[in-house]
């Protein structure tokens, strides 16, 4: 396979993954978007976390909330727990990397808030501890996962929502997570900003 064929292959595999996900994920994406919309209507906030590419996804979601997606609107309260290098490194140094998100949630999370937890494997210890901390604070969890959901799946409660991409490849899962994040942003805009229905 030459490089041109490889690029074409990657496009085709990404399209196949998204196509396979459509019927499986529409319902949980809508449910998650409605849950997030109600959270914001009730003047609560959305915290997000992830590692590596998933950290970038967490920041992507937060930036769309604080700035805007495709509709002019006020800022919505959202915070990516991945962005404060001083806090993350202090917790990792003094305690452990597994606690870099859970300790922030203990200080920042409140009942009625939502945690957007993103993990392609479902096994990242800091994400697992973040979910436990969110439950202690009375928060619901929206989890973006892949593969078999990992240990993360076993921690979710009946009021939590898992959006699991049916793929094994980390790259394909992350590409679909980006689309899911845009779908969530679009739902929130349409639920909270009536004029966005026209676009």
From Swiss-Prot:
It comes from the Bacteria. Its cofactor is Zn(2+). One of its GO terms (cellular component) is cytoplasm. Substrate binds at residues 51-53, 64, 93-94, 119-121, 124, 174. Its EC number is 5.3.1.28. The keyword Ribonucleoprotein does not apply. SUPFAM superfamilies: SIS domain. Catalyzes the isomerization of sedoheptulose 7-phosphate in D-glycero-D-manno-heptose 7-phosphate. HAMAP family: GmhA. This is Phosphoheptose isomerase. It comes from Coxiella burnetii (strain RSA 331 / Henzerling II). The gene is gmhA.
């Amino acid at each position: 396979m030459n490089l041109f064929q490889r690029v074409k292959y990657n496009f085709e595999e990404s399209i196949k993954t998204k196509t396979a996900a459509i019927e499986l994920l529409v319902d949980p994406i809508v449910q998650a978007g409605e849950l997030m919309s109600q959270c914001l209507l009730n003047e609560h906030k959305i915290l997000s976390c992830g590692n590596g590419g998933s950290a970038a996804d967490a920041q992507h979601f937060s930036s769309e909330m604080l700035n805007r997606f495709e509709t002019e609107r006020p800022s919505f309260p959202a915070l990516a727990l991945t962005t404060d290098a001083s806090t993350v490194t202090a917790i990792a140094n003094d305690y452990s990397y597994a606690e870099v998100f859970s300790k922030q949630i203990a200080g920042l999370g409140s009942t009625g808030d939502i945690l957007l937890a993103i993990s392609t494997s479902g096994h990242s210890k800091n994400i697992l501890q973040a979910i436990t901390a969110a439950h202690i604070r009375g928060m619901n969890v929206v989890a973006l996962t892949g593969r078999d959901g990992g240990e993360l799946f076993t921690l979710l409660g009946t009021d939590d929502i898992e959006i699991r991409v049916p793929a094994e490849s980390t790259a394909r899962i992350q590409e679909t997570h980006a689309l899911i994040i845009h779908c969530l942003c679009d739902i929130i805009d349409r639920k909270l900003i009536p004029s966005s229905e026209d676009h």
